[in-house]
């Protein structure tokens, strides 16, 4: 075991991440989604109980709809979407990511109940940076959809409505139930068929983020390297 850790086999022996991930969308809200929607502050007392705290994510109706999407699309992952907004504003809130993973992620271990990893979240305006860091802790994927853009006039300036807000044009739909394809090799988001490119995702798949996804989260990398250093020291390997 020590020799294996000294050779970093805790990481090198892991399978590569899937080249193609099919997702089905669930629009949790229109506009920015606060982490308080995912893990309400008034339910903080239950955060140590993953199963119990998971029941407060968004709403009971939302949870039923997510389960329905999973039942109808057993070969696809549910992607939580902030339509016309940014996902995860407010705080990093690990419990919020844990809740999203609990409902839509992958089971971390068959021996540890209610601990899931690798959720997929998305926002028209991307993911809040501090929340995106927490998504990386679980080996998840954050998608900057860019599915709405500002409508421009002939001079290239945004067209403003009567409320002094820019008029938006939809580039493609992510309405609840929409099936999309994430290609991790090409680092792009495609339509259901995988033929039509919708948006570039290279920022979601930096070398470091790919490591986190392969390992099942950043903690696996951090503590794996600590164990590797210990193993090398024990075996007098530099």
Locate predicted features:
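Fe-S-dependent hydro-lyases/dehydratases of central metabolism
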Residues: 1-238
């Amino acid at each position: 075991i020590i020799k294996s850790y000294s050779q970093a086999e805790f990481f090198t022996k892991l399978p590569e991440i899937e080249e193609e991930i099919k997702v089905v969308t669930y629009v949790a809200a229109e506009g920015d989604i606060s982490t308080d929607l995912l893990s309400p502050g008034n339910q903080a007392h239950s955060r140590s109980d993953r199963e119990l705290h998971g029941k407060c994510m968004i709403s009971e109706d939302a949870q039923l709809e997510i389960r329905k999407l999973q039942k109808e699309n057993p070969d696809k992952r549910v992607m939580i979407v902030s339509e016309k907004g940014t996902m995860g504003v407010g705080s990093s809130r690990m419990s919020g990511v844990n809740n999203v993973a609990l409902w839509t992620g992958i089971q971390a271990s068959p021996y540890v109940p209610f601990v899931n990893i690798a959720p997929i979240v998305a926002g028209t305006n991307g993911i809040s940076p501090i929340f995106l860091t927490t998504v990386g802790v679980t080996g998840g994927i954050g998608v900057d959809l860019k599915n709405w853009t500002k409508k421009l006039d002939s001079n290239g300036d945004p067209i403003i409505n009567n409320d002094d807000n820019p008029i938006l044009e939809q580039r493609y739909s992510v309405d609840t139930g929409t099936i999309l394809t994430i290609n991790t090799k090409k680092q792009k988001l495609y339509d259901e068929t995988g033929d039509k490119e919708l948006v570039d995702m290279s920022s979601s798949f930096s070398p470091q983020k790919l490591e986190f996804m392969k390992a099942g989260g950043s903690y696996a990398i951090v503590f794996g390297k600590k164990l590797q250093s210990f193993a090398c020291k024990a075996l007098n390997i530099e």
